[in-house]
Amino acid sequence: MTRISLTRYLVEEQRKHNTIQPELRLLIEVVARACKAISNAVSKGALAGVLGSAGTGNVQGETQQKLDVIANEVLLDANEWGGHLAAMASEEMESFYEIPNRYPKGEYLLMFDPLDGSSNIDVNVSIGTIFSVLHMPKPGQTVTEADFMQPGTHQVAAGYAVYGPQTTLVLTVGNGVHMFTLDREAGSFVLTHSNVTIPDDTKEFAINMSNMRHWAPPVRRYIDECLAGEEGPRGKNFNMRWVASMVADVHRILTRGGVFMYPWDKREPEKPGKLRLMYEANPMAMLVEQAGGAATNGHQRIMDVQPEKLHQRVSVILGSKNEVERVTRYHLEAEDKA
């Protein structure tokens, strides 16, 4: 059986659908190479002295881990000189990073969470890199933050790399979801799962149950029904999973179904959610929808949300379509009664 590398897959998609421009193909390959470098750093862990806090904070007010900083630098260094990008934006940087004038500039914008789930680094649990690609609205002109303010429907590619027992790159360019496993001996990502689909129904949910007392009534209603099991209104037993790493939780859902929820809660009522829209929720929503699932903020499709700022937050409910639609319906019913 012929093994299909990431490069070959992208070239063949370019030939078949003519939707992957050569510059986009090269950009994705550069991101993949950066993910290989990050995977190598993660796998060395304490041997390379990369565990623990960096002693700094990011724009979100979160403590940066050493690997957060390393992963961010790897992605910046790998992508700035290739000529495919006009600018980049990262969870770890307050403002966007425009490609320096000493390098050629391209027609794409890249956004990323360089190391999602970094609180799990020191305990050796799966973490990952999430990325999203947009067209630069005005190629050749000076980049502004407004250029990034595009809804998720404008994404031309989205994906993540999960660093676990295997390193797996999960990608969509708008023609389904495909998974590539890193062959460390060959040094390349190899296609291992094509056209991944999420089942419409599930018996598994992922949410941080310790926050139950802070949830809005629609979320409480949904979880209470799940916990009631066979004797409850759902008539079936549910299992709960929670890794505290969005990449790991979404990867499980893409692999076997389920629903992931990181909802608004009363602890910080002024914030619409915890996760970031532009480089966490949008790329994951694109992947989930391309796999036949759904993704909403409880009120509307995530990819229809119009961004207003780079680090905008959003409530997230995504995964198996029928479950996401049920949770969303509960939110809309609560709105109608209010």
From Swiss-Prot:
Substrate binds at D116, G117, S118, S119, N208, K274. Mg(2+) 2 binds at D113, D116, E280. GO terms for cellular component: cytosol. Its EC number is 3.1.3.11. Its cofactor is Mg(2+). Pathway: Carbohydrate biosynthesis; gluconeogenesis. Keywords: Carbohydrate metabolism, Cytoplasm, Hydrolase, Magnesium, Metal-binding. It is found in: Cytoplasm. It comes from the Bacteria. GO terms for biological process: fructose 1,6-bisphosphate metabolic process; fructose 6-phosphate metabolic process; fructose metabolic process; gluconeogenesis; sucrose biosynthetic process. Binds 2 magnesium ions per subunit. The keyword Methyltransferase does not apply. It catalyses: beta-D-fructose 1,6-bisphosphate + H2O = beta-D-fructose 6-phosphate + phosphate. This is Fructose-1,6-bisphosphatase class 1 1.
